[in-house]
């Protein structure tokens, strides 16, 4: 591991390898490259100090360097202990951008690295957060809560992750002067949030009146949720399962828990690989969608003894329980493509016999002798066992992130302590930036046609409530 004053990466010698892959990714990320060309001269992010917590991949490296090209100062960590691509982290460190990310870092290291986002190299503090999952945001919120005297929760962790996180907060409270977290909260002008789980956290904070700064929900931009969540998972899920297990997918029975955008992409991914796909759902609308797509909609109890492959994609907890896993076939494959690891009751497996097969692949034996194969310890399988979504689809997501950062930074008085989404015009702009790359020719409305349907010739073409 290479440790320097302002970076921690696996091996700084991987920087050249990372730089070559970044160069290739740039060709596949027209939205970000167009954003550099459009905004580079005006430097809209000059003065912004962005604390970034998002999977440290090759695609994220292109995002980081786009933010830098627009004037931002940046510190970065990965938002998952297994999702870092070490050559990407090395390339960013070699470019002089502080990054703290190692594939396979411990939970203690993860939270220590996250805390480094807020200890700025010039002795100051960040003034913006770019988040994925909400951990950086929660560091500020829970730190301030404890600093203000409400510390009882620190002694009541509900998971191993919370135990480590709360221990870090106690350490920071002891190290930092009184008022440090209050100053940090005041310094932050806004956060842009990448994923469903983090967005849920933001809406809960806003509902309780506890959100400390304005937030933009990037996840619910159409060019994020209907592309990254759907088409990204459609390609990356099976990639992760295959790299982890080398299993023949065709003919297998696969179970997908959840039929939101991620579940839809996951089910399609498995079907395209030749699997017979089962789906579980709590929402009657999503259940009906799954059934009309030709999937068999069942409960997890029905699927447990039937399926060969299990994928959770719900954003909820305890979707696959110990009892479900006890009922599974020998060497059934169990994995998750939701943000957190609590969709599968991994903690309840800790007292069983574990055999590590290779990095992020474990075989767990139950008392009766039957085994399951668990991928990435229940964390994101597509990033833990593979390299995540392709560059092109991530360009759309990350262009939204860049525009959200520009919007929050350049219009500080426009937003209250609430959760916002980007306007439809920007959503359409992000989509338009990606058309030429794949040879799309867009039709144009004539003035009379635009008037007939009541829209501008240049858009937006749909009302805010339109469901794509």
Swiss-Prot record:
Substrate binds at residues 57, 132, 194, 224, 228. It is found in: Cytoplasm. GO terms for cellular component: cytosol. Pathway: Amino-acid biosynthesis; L-homocysteine biosynthesis; L-homocysteine from S-adenosyl-L-homocysteine: step 1/1. InterPro entries: Adenosylhomocyst_ase-like_sf, Adenosylhomocysteinase-like, Ado_hCys_hydrolase_NAD-bd, NAD(P)-bd_dom_sf, S-Ado-L-homoCys_hydrolase_CS. Binds 1 NAD(+) per subunit. The keyword Hydrolase applies. It catalyses: S-adenosyl-L-homocysteine + H2O = L-homocysteine + adenosine. One of its GO terms (molecular function) is adenosylhomocysteinase activity. CDD domains: SAHH (cd00401). Its cofactor is NAD(+). NAD(+) binds at residues 195-197, 229, 258-263, 281, 316, 337-339, 382. Its EC number is 3.13.2.1. Keywords: Cytoplasm, Hydrolase, NAD, One-carbon metabolism. Pfam families: AdoHcyase (PF05221), AdoHcyase_NAD (PF00670). GO terms for biological process: L-homocysteine biosynthetic process; one-carbon metabolic process; S-adenosylmethionine cycle. The keyword Transmembrane does not apply. Belongs to the adenosylhomocysteinase family. PANTHER family: ADENOSYLHOMOCYSTEINASE (PTHR23420:SF0). May play a key role in the regulation of the intracellular concentration of adenosylhomocysteine. This is Adenosylhomocysteinase. It comes from Methylorubrum extorquens (strain PA1) (Methylobacterium extorquens).
């Amino acid at each position: 591991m290479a440790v320097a004053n302002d970076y921690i990466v696996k091996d700084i010698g991987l920087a050249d390898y990372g730089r070559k892959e970044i160069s290739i990714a740039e060709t596949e990320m027209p939205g970000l490259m167009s954003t550099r060309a459009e905004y580079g001269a005006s430097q809209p992010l000059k003065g912004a100090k962005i604390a970034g917590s998002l999977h440290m991949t090759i695609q994220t490296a292109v995002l980081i360097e786009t933010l830098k090209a627009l004037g931002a100062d940046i510190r970065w960590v990965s938002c998952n202990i297994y999702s870092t691509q070490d050559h990407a982290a090395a390339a960013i460190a070699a470019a002089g951008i502080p990054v703290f990310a190692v594939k396979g870092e411990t939970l203690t290291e993860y939270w220590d690295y996250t805390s480094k986002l807020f200890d700025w190299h010039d002795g100051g503090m960040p003034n913006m957060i770019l988040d994925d999952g909400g951990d950086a945001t929660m560091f500020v919120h829970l730190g301030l809560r404890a600093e203000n005297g409400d510390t009882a929760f620190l002694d009541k962790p509900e998971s191993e992750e919370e135990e480590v996180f709360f221990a870090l907060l106690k350490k920071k409270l002891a190290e930092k002067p009184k008022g440090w977290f209050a100053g940090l909260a005041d310094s932050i002008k806004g956060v842009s949030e990448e994923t469903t789980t983090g967005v849920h956290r933001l809406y809960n904070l806003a509902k309780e009146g506890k959100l400390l700064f304005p937030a933009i929900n990037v996840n619910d931009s159409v060019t994020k949720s209907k592309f990254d969540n759907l088409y990204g998972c459609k390609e990356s899920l099976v990639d992760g399962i295959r790299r982890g297990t080398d299993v023949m997918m065709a003919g297998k029975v696969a179970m997908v828990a959840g039929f939101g955008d991620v579940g839809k992409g996951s089910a399609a991914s498995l079907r395209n690989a030749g699997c017979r796909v089962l789906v579980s759902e709590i929402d009657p609308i999503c259940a009906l969608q799954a059934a009309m797509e030709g999937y068999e909609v069942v409960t997890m109890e029905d699927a447990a003894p039937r399926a060969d492959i299990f994928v959770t994609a719900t954003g909820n907890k305890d979707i696959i329980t110990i009892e479900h896993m006890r009922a599974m076939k020998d060497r059934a494959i169990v994995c998750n493509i939701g943000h957190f690891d609590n969709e599968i009751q991994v903690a309840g497996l800790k007292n069983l016999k574990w055999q590590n097969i290779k990095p992020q692949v474990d075989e767990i034996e139950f008392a009766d002798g039957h085994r399951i194969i668990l991928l990435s310890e229940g964390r994101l399988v597509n990033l833990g066992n593979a390299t995540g979504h392709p560059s092109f689809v991530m360009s759309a997501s990350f262009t939204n992130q860049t525009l959200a950062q520009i919007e929050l930074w350049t219009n500080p008085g426009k937003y209250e302590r609430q959760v916002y989404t980007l306007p439809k015009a920007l959503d359409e702009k992000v989509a338009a930036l990606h058309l030429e790359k794949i040879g799309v020719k867009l039709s144009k409305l004539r003035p009379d046609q635009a008037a007939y349907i009541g829209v501008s010739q240049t858009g937006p073409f749909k009302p805010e409530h339109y469901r794509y």
